[in-house]
Amino acid sequence: MIFDKGNVEDFDKELWDAIHAEEERQEHHIELIASENMVSKAVMAAQGSVLTNKYAEGYPGNRYYGGTECVDIVETLAIERAKKLFGAAFANVQAHSGSQANAAAYMALIEAGDTVLGMDLAAGGHLTHGSPVNFSGKTYHFVSYSVDADTEMLNYEAILEQAKAVQPKLIVAGASAYSRSIDFEKFRAIADHVGAYLMVDMAHIAGLVAAGVHPSPVPYAHIVTSTTHKTLRGPRGGLILTNDEALAKKINSAVFPGLQGGPLEHVIAAKAVAFKEALDPAFKDYAQAIIDNTAAMAAVFAQDDRFRLISGGTDNHVFLVDVTKVIANGKLAQNLLDEVNITLNKNAIPFETLSPFKTSGIRIGCAAITSRGMGVKESQTIARLIIKALVNHDQETILEEVRQEVRQLTDAFPLYKK
């Protein structure tokens, strides 16, 4: 019987070796990809539970299948915790991803072909904010706003003038690579001025918002979407919030049956665990530490004239650095740092001149290293190691020194091995 197969290591050695190799990579690499984090063992345990066996199309108390009394409890816990965590009246926890959450929000608010104002990808937006290669850009008429050419920050007066000109049905705020605090109240005022809905994608900053160390979009947006990983430190999944009952019904219909069938109740259980963790007062200390670490790391780059810190600083968990004075492009920087066990990603910078496959910049985030217990001192050390590697990218002896220093850091802050 299948139940006799035992654990993965015994049953499928080939697969287990790949999983184990990834565990070792995470343990011994410094993770700086801004969209990644390290979940608790409790989150992993919930996601690996027997809930994966259960189909439950519909919503708690209104399912299409029988035997859902237990998963109803699980999903209701997740919903109520999400509402409490973010101060929202309604929450949908079924979206499989942030992209699915955004798609559902669009379906609830607008029709195909409607005009939407969203942040340009090169300025820090996301694929689902109107990229022509994404469903959003193919389905809706997106017009992009950017950042100010001088400050590399959002210019709300310019966005208002653009909104007046294009008269969007929806304005999308939020970003995947914007290092500054976003004024959601101003965005709502702009939306109201032109009679548009406001949707905020807070996927990257959700943990900071939950902890109260970043302004919340919930009081201002008609709909807020998010992922449940990144700074929120939960499983990979989506979340949709609103304070409008009529929109809540449209959101639920858009998710199911509009976009998805059965929800992933094992992932929803893991979301519930993550929400409970984020409701703990200690989570605020964690979120503040992310901001402190990010600011400390960014400051090291700001003080080195061989690098250019985009917008001159950071208010959240992420920052971007133009690396082209020391290495040809961001792709080469990413690959080089991979070789010394520092993981981050190439990233376009505002008014990018290189292709998206190369880019002028790199994106750095501090959520994962903060989860490991690293602080300001370690963040500054990591910045110096990155600089040391990039400046000496053709010096193997120095690169080996960086590898050894990285290993010393990761050994001092073990991930799951105690």
From Swiss-Prot:
<comment type="pathway">
    <text>One-carbon metabolism; tetrahydrofolate interconversion.</text>
</comment>
<dbReference type="InterPro" id="IPR039429">
    <property type="entry name" value="SHMT-like_dom"/>
</dbReference>
<feature type="modified residue" description="N6-(pyridoxal phosphate)lysine">
    <location>
        <position position="230"/>
    </location>
</feature>
<dbReference type="InterPro" id="IPR015421">
    <property type="entry name" value="PyrdxlP-dep_Trfase_major"/>
</dbReference>
<keyword id="KW-0808">Transferase</keyword>
<keyword id="KW-0554">One-carbon metabolism</keyword>
<comment type="subunit">
    <text>Homodimer.</text>
</comment>
<dbReference type="GO" id="GO:0030170">
    <property type="term" value="F:pyridoxal phosphate binding"/>
</dbReference>
<keyword id="KW-0028">Amino-acid biosynthesis</keyword>
<dbReference type="GO" id="GO:0035999">
    <property type="term" value="P:tetrahydrofolate interconversion"/>
</dbReference>
<feature type="binding site">
    <location>
        <position position="121"/>
    </location>
    <ligand>
        <name>(6S)-5,6,7,8-tetrahydrofolate</name>
    </ligand>
</feature>
<comment type="pathway">
    <text>Amino-acid biosynthesis; glycine biosynthesis; glycine from L-serine: step 1/1.</text>
</comment>
<feature type="site" description="Plays an important role in substrate specificity">
    <location>
        <position position="229"/>
    </location>
</feature>
<dbReference type="Pfam" id="PF00464">
    <property type="entry name" value="SHMT"/>
</dbReference>
<dbReference type="InterPro" id="IPR015422">
    <property type="entry name" value="PyrdxlP-dep_Trfase_small"/>
</dbReference>
<comment type="similarity">
    <text>Belongs to the SHMT family.</text>
</comment>
<feature type="binding site">
    <location>
        <begin position="355"/>
        <end position="357"/>
    </location>
    <ligand>
        <name>(6S)-5,6,7,8-tetrahydrofolate</name>
    </ligand>
</feature>
<dbReference type="GO" id="GO:0019264">
    <property type="term" value="P:glycine biosynthetic process from serine"/>
</dbReference>
<comment type="function">
    <text>Catalyzes the reversible interconversion of serine and glycine with tetrahydrofolate (THF) serving as the one-carbon carrier. This reaction serves as the major source of one-carbon groups required for the biosynthesis of purines, thymidylate, methionine, and other important biomolecules. Also exhibits THF-independent aldolase activity toward beta-hydroxyamino acids, producing glycine and aldehydes, via a retro-aldol mechanism.</text>
</comment>
<dbReference type="GO" id="GO:0005829">
    <property type="term" value="C:cytosol"/>
</dbReference>
<dbReference type="InterPro" id="IPR001085">
    <property type="entry name" value="Ser_HO-MeTrfase"/>
</dbReference>
<dbReference type="InterPro" id="IPR049943">
    <property type="entry name" value="Ser_HO-MeTrfase-like"/>
</dbReference>
<dbReference type="InterPro" id="IPR019798">
    <property type="entry name" value="Ser_HO-MeTrfase_PLP_BS"/>
</dbReference>
<dbReference type="InterPro" id="IPR015424">
    <property type="entry name" value="PyrdxlP-dep_Trfase"/>
</dbReference>
<keyword id="KW-0663">Pyridoxal phosphate</keyword>
<dbReference type="GO" id="GO:0004372">
    <property type="term" value="F:glycine hydroxymethyltransferase activity"/>
</dbReference>
<protein>
    <recommendedName>
        <fullName>Serine hydroxymethyltransferase</fullName>
        <ecNumber>2.1.2.1</ecNumber>
    </recommendedName>
</protein>
<feature type="binding site">
    <location>
        <begin position="125"/>
        <end position="127"/>
    </location>
    <ligand>
        <name>(6S)-5,6,7,8-tetrahydrofolate</name>
    </ligand>
</feature>
<keyword id="KW-0963">Cytoplasm</keyword>
